[in-house]
Amino acid sequence: MVMKFKMSKNVICYTWLSVCLSSAIPAFAVQPTLKPSDISIPAISEESQLATKRATTRLTQSHYRKIKLDDDFSEKIFDRYIKNLDFNHNTFLQSDIDELRQKYGTKLDEQLNQGDLSAAFDIYDVMMKRRYERYTYALSLLDKEPDLNGQDQIEIDREKAAAPQTEADANKLWDARVKNDIINLKLKDKKWSEIKAKLTKRYNLAIRRLTQTKADDIVQIYLNAFAREIDPHTSYLSPRTAKSFNESINLSLEGIGTTLQSEDDEISIKSLVPGAPAERSKKLHPGDKIIGVGQATGDIEDVVGWRLEDLVEKIKGKKGTKVRLEIEPAKGGKSRIITLVRDKVRIEDQAAKLTFEKVSGKNIAVIKIPSFYIGLTEDVKKLLVKLENQKAEALIVDLRENGGGALTEAVALSGLFITDGPVVQVRDAYQRIRVHEDDDATQQYKGLLFVMINRYSASASEIFAAAMQDYRRGIIIGQNTFGKGTVQQSRSLNFIYDLDQSPLGVLQYTIQKFYRVNGGSTQLKGVAADINFPEIIDAKEYGEDKEDNALAWDKIPSASYMEVGNINYIDNAVNILNEKHLARIAKDPEFVALNEELKVRNERRDRKFLSLNYKMRKAENDKDDARRLKDLNERFKREGKKALKDIDDLPKDYEAPDFFLKEAEKIAADFVIFNSDQKINQANGLSEAKTESKK
C-alpha cells in the first residue's frame, strides 16, 4: 500500500510509509544546515529485540493490572506511541496516522510478543522525516520579520487536538509556533537580528538532534507507550537511562537535584529532590520549562530541542560551582534566569528537622519530613524527646512536597503516634491482602497533632496522613494529596544466567495497591484535608486523577482498629478551627494577594488560545509584573524593607515567607486554646456535679 500526500510547490510524492523531501524543499533564504539524506533511522539491535520480548512477558504476567494483549490493546499502544512522538499533534499528518494504523494498528501485540520492533522503527522513521520537514518550514519563516500586530492566536494545549489534515494545515500550526517563539524572545528585549540568529540556531539544532537518535531512544519511547498504557507508574528504562537513574539516586552525585521530563522539543521539571539546591532555592517548581543553561559566566545556551541526557550533563557539575537556568514558569509570564550553586544531595538535608514557634503565647513544634528515608522513625523519636523537653503544646508534622519513600518507615512513624494496630493494607495482583501493623504497644507522642499536606504529598505520606485521620489521632490541614496509592518494583531484564549479555534495561511496574485501615484506597482520591488551604498547586493540572489510565479507586473490608480520638470532639474542634482559619486568611494580606494570583492562574488555565499580538502580550506581561511588584512591595513594607523599583531588582537569594506554615501554626495555637477551654469546662462541670450531689 502506498501513501499519498501533497507538499509545497504542488510536488506529489509517493512513499512506502515514509516521507519524500529531497526535491520538494524550495530555496529559502534561511536553509537547514543538514540535508534530508543526513536523517536516517538507526538499526534494530538483537539486544533491543530481546529486551522487548522479556519486557512484554513480565508486563503481561506480573503487573497488578491484568491485561489482555490483543488487537484492542494494540490499538491503544499505537495511539499512545503516536502521542509520545507528537504530543502537540503538529508533526504527523492525519494521512500518516491513518496509513500507519492500517498497517500496524492491530499488529503490535504480536510483534511485542515476538520482540519484533519493525513497527516502532518504521513509525519513528516517518516522524523523523516529518519533523525535518516542519523545522525546514519553520526556518523559512525567518526570512523576514513577521507582522505581530494582527489577531492571530496559538492553541495552548493541543494534547487532545486533531492532527493536521494537510500540509497547509500543519504549516498554519507552525506559523503560530514560530510567531510565539519570536514574541517570547521579543519580550526579553531582543532585536529582530538577534531573534533570527537565535531561532535559526535553535531550529537547526533540533534537526541535528534527529541525526543523534539511537536505537535505545526509540525502544524506550515505544516500550513506554506499552507500559504507560497499563498504568502511569509503569515504565521501561533503557540501559543508558537506567545508569543515569542509578546515578541520580546516589547521594554523592553533585548537581542541583531535579527530575526532568521531555515532551516534543521541550524539557520541563517533573519533581525536585528534597534538600537539594533546586528545592532549597524555592524558585523552581514542577512544570517549569528549562529553555536555557549557562555556567557561572558566559552566555546562556538555548537548550530547546536538546536531548534530555545532554541537558542533564550540562546542568550537573562540581560542588560549589554555579549554573544558570533560563526558566519559562509553568504558571505563565516571561522567562527568568535563576542561579543555583551545585551541591551534594546530603542525607542531612533530607532528614527530619524540628523547629519551634511561639504563637499567641503557645509553644508550637513543627517536624518537617522531606521524605520517608530509611532511619526516619529513629530520627523522629529523638526529635519527639526534644519536643517534650521544650514543653511543646502542639505538633505539626509537615509532609508538604513529600513524595513518599519506604513503606516500613510510614508504618513505623505512624506507630509513634498510636499505641498499636493496623496502619495500612496492601493488596497484590492475586488479590491477597496483607495488613501492616504497629505492634510495639507504645505511643511516643500523645499530644495535639496536625499533619500538613499538599498536592505533592504522595505514597508513604498519604499512608501516614490517612492513618492519623482514620484513627482520629490528628487533624489534617492543607490541600488534597496526590492520590498515588500503588507500589512499584524495579527488575532488570537481564537474567542471572545471562553471562555475556550486555545490559537490556530495567522495568519498573506496579505490583500492589495501598488501602487505608478503613478499607478505602488512597489511589486516585488521595487524602482530603480536614481544614483546607488555597490550592497553590493546581489540582486541575497535577495529581493521579489527571492521568488518563490511572488505576481506579476502590475499597476492601476495613481492618480491625479502634479510633483513639473522640469523633464528636474532633469534629467540633475542626469546625471551630476552620471558622477561625477562614476569617483570618480573608484578611491576611499574603492570602489576599495569593488569591488574586490564583484567580489569574485559573483564568489562564481555562483559556484555550494565546494571542500572537505582541502589544497585547507585552501589556499582559507588564500587568503581571506590576501586580507582583505591588504585592512584593507591600510585603517589604510590612517587613520594614526598602521598596523595589522593578521586579527584576528582587535579590537572587530572596526567600518568600512560608505563610502557609505560619497559618498552620496559628491553627495549632487555636487548638491548644480550644483544648484547654474544654478541659476547664469539663472540670467545672464535674465540680458542679459534685456540689449538686452534696446538696
Swiss-Prot record:
It is found in: Cell inner membrane. It is an enzyme of class 3 (hydrolase). One of its GO terms (cellular component) is outer membrane-bounded periplasmic space. The keyword Repeat does not apply. Keywords: Cell inner membrane, Cell membrane, Hydrolase, Membrane, Protease, Serine protease, Signal. It catalyses: The enzyme shows specific recognition of a C-terminal tripeptide, Xaa-Yaa-Zaa, in which Xaa is preferably Ala or Leu, Yaa is preferably Ala or Tyr, and Zaa is preferably Ala, but then cleaves at a variable distance from the C-terminus. A typical cleavage is -Ala-Ala-|-Arg-Ala-Ala-Lys-Glu-Asn-Tyr-Ala-Leu-Ala-Ala. It is a peripheral membrane protein. It comes from the Bacteria. The active site is at S459 (charge relay system), D470 (charge relay system), K484 (charge relay system). One of its GO terms (biological process) is proteolysis. Involved in the cleavage of a C-terminal peptide of 11 residues from the precursor form of penicillin-binding protein 3 (PBP3). May be involved in protection of the bacterium from thermal and osmotic stresses. This is Tail-specific protease. It comes from Haemophilus influenzae (strain ATCC 51907 / DSM 11121 / KW20 / Rd). The gene is prc.
